[in-house]
Amino acid sequence: MISSGDVIWWGNQGLTVSESPYWQRVNDTILKQLPPPDKTMLDAGLEGRWFIGIGNHEVWGDPKIEGVLSAVPYLRKLGVTPENLIYKFDYQGVRFIFLWSGKYDYRSPSLWDGDRPKYAEQMKQMQQWLDEAKANSIKKAFITFHYPVFCRAGLGPIPEPDNPHKLIASYAKDMEVVVFNGHVHTTEMYDVDGVKYLMLGGGGAEQDPILPGRTSIKVTADYPPDLYWKGQPPKEEYNYVLVDVQPDQKTKFTLNRFRPWSAEPFGTEALFS
């Protein structure tokens, strides 16, 4: 199970699972419900089933990520520390990469200001990890970080020059590359230069389409199209995506949704089909 971040509000009401009402809720509703890792996962060095691309809310009032490391201590074995918020692992022929986009700056709320490590160092590390995957004949890479590469709503996309799309897209000819983002509270999807982008901000927080002024933002006429709402204004929706990965086959994405305003509130939809 992968999260693109912001699973809590802040650390100002307690840091660890034993203190924070937010981490207690994550623990009770998600982590405790998951079965222990099986032998295949343990052999791959994975001692849990839930992995997060750390968002700005995880460090708000908790700069040393005590909450994250108390809830999912096995991330330490993948290299996560208060000074390093990025990591990677391989599982059944897929390379998983998790980056750190930043702590939030109200003056530019999607600016990649991550400093553990800084943007340039993260890009160098991602390039090394993707080169390594390519050399090992890994054909699929899933990259997760909080701020969105492409976005038409809410807080908007990562601004240039620190938007990683061009670097990520340079690997699309060699492997299937999928990027999972969050931060903005709605759902959008893009297929740009061979890279599939899923902005999955419908995990539970109040949705931008019901917040004044956040339903949409101005973008250029040639901005990539959102393939989810397909030009229609986004609406309130809560969802998660199941990703079916099989060797040497096209990855399948199935979104399961809840629309509280709809006469048919529950539904599923195949993405990128």
Show which residues each predicted segment covers:
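Active-site beta-strand/loop signature of hydrolases that rely on acidic residues for catalysis
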Residues: 1-12, 55, 142-146
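Glycine-centered small-residue hotspots that permit tight backbone geometry or close packing
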Residues: 5, 201-205, 260-263
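A short C-terminal boundary segment appended to hydrolase-like catalytic domains
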Residues: 224-273
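Short acidic, glycine-rich surface-loop motifs adjacent to enzyme active sites
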Residues: 133-153
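Short, well-ordered beta-to-alpha junction loops that form the rim of enzyme active sites
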Residues: 56, 100-101, 144-149, 183-184, ...
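A short hydrophobic beta-strand element
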Residues: 145, 198, 251-255
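Extended active-site neighborhood of metal-dependent phosphoesterases/phosphodiesterases
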Residues: 10-135, 156-158, 163-178, 184-244
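A short, hydrophobic/aromatic-rich structural module that often spans a beta strand
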Residues: 60-61, 113, 151-158, 197, ...
